[in-house]
Amino acid sequence: MIDETLFDAEEKMEKAVSVARDDLSSIRTGRANPGMFSRINVDYYGATTPITQLSSINVPEARMVVIKPYEANQLRNIEDAIRNSDLGVNPTNDGNIIRVSIPQLTEERRRDLVKQAKAKGEDAKVSVRNIRRKAMEELARIKKDGEAGEDEVSRAEKDLDKTTHTYTHQIDELVKHKEGELLEV
């Protein structure tokens, strides 16, 4: 029962780190990156569909992204979705493909994006700590019900603390890396 609780908590913490990694990759840096479009959804025949499922996204240059829709009639919808996103870019449509030029970030915008990255990192760490709290409650219940001895539960709590520290450290590293990317001119 203790092992299941620890395994479940670690699995959830891994997922929280994965979500944080995805969230941070969606924050645009000064360079073109196909991942920055991963959170954009397009209205596709009445259904909301990720842009990555409707087109191929390539980066031919450091500050240019080329988006080629699989269906030419979706050009306008994709262009509108990009324009209405929070990326702050202006796509151009030449009839076959959409070109997105990535402008240089201003110092003020960089600082805002760093704040955004730190906030996303903090949200992920709160999520990890909530997972830890729930696992600790489960361990306390196991101890109270007499399903395991006090020594076993104490050892499991220490293991859980180590695991929590490992995952919060991973999140800190992700945020630090993203901050470095954002502040790099």
Swiss-Prot record:
Q: According to its UniProt record, what is one Pfam family this protein matches?
A: RRF
Instruction: Give the start-end ranges of region Disordered.
Output: 145-164
Compartment(s) of residence: Cytoplasm
Family matches, as CDD domains? RRF
Keywords assigned by UniProt, alphabetized: Cytoplasm, Protein biosynthesis
Bilayer-spanning residue ranges? none
Q: Which InterPro entries match?
A: Ribosome_recyc_fac (IPR002661), Ribosome_recyc_fac_dom (IPR023584), RRF_sf (IPR036191)
For this UniProt entry, the molecular function terms from Gene Ontology, in alphabetical order, are: ribosomal large subunit binding
Protein origin, superkingdom: Bacteria
GO BP terms, alphabetized: translational termination
> Would the keyword Methyltransferase turn up in this protein's UniProt record?
no
GO CC: one term?
cytoplasm
Q: Which residue windows are coiled coil?
A: none
* Keyword Protein biosynthesis (UniProt): yes
Family assignment? Belongs to the RRF family.
Its annotated function is as follows:
Responsible for the release of ribosomes from messenger RNA at the termination of protein biosynthesis. May increase the efficiency of translation by recycling ribosomes from one round of translation to another.
Q: Which HAMAP family match?
A: RRF (MF_00040)
Q: What is this protein called?
A: Ribosome-recycling factor
Species of origin reads: Mycobacterium sp. (strain KMS)
